[in-house]
Amino acid sequence: MTTDSAARPAAGVTPAAAARWLPYRPMILALFGYLVIRGTVMLNGYLYADDFAFRYWADTFGLTPEYVFRSYYGHVQPFGHLAQWFLQAAFPGSFTALMLWTLLMQVVTFALLWRIVLRLTGSDLAAFLAFLVPAFSMFGFETGVWWCEITETVPYGLFMMISIWALVRALQGDAGRWWLWSGLAFVAAMMSISKGAVGLLVLFMIVAALPIGVPRRRGIIRAFRLAPLYWLVLALLLALSLGGLGLGCVDAAILSEE
């Protein structure tokens, strides 16, 4: 009687569990490699230039609307200010804490990107390439070492990826309130960076131009008719956000002189 030890799962791991984790192995290895490479670069960096303004505000201001919604050269990033304030309160002056927070957010973002592409294409190669380009591009490098840029782009990237993930689930007919979760995540993305309004166009292009859950692309009219309330509510919130940005909670010119 012979046994095939190579096909036998590890002790304590059922065949069902082993099969369930198999599709995630390439993603886990890629994300681990990202952690090692980017973590080495980021943790050997330092704060400079505009970074110190954010550290100073977090250290000297209370957690008030004035602080959370204050603009910096015309840009508003509430989630970035919140993260900076809590990190400064919990780990005063710690550059390591800032970078570990950034790494965690980026790893979750890229894991979601991997899952979205794998779900749509069924190809590990396509998912790996989709992960590779933003993860190791110069833009990805900049948003991983410059804290001033991180406060805006990293939360925005995460919330947009959550919104797209939920949107794909909704388009494929999965049970659940995926349209709602997609909309809420996009609102969070708008609150991460005031320049992120273009994200709504990205969401609409995904629905209109990609044949997700249908044999052929929907086009502009069918994309709108699919979920009119979703688009109208997000467009209204976007208009209110841009209007509030135009009025400005705090004048950027005054802040830049502080």
Model segments located where?
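Polytopic membrane enzymes that build or remodel cell-surface glycoconjugates and lipids
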Residues: T2-E258
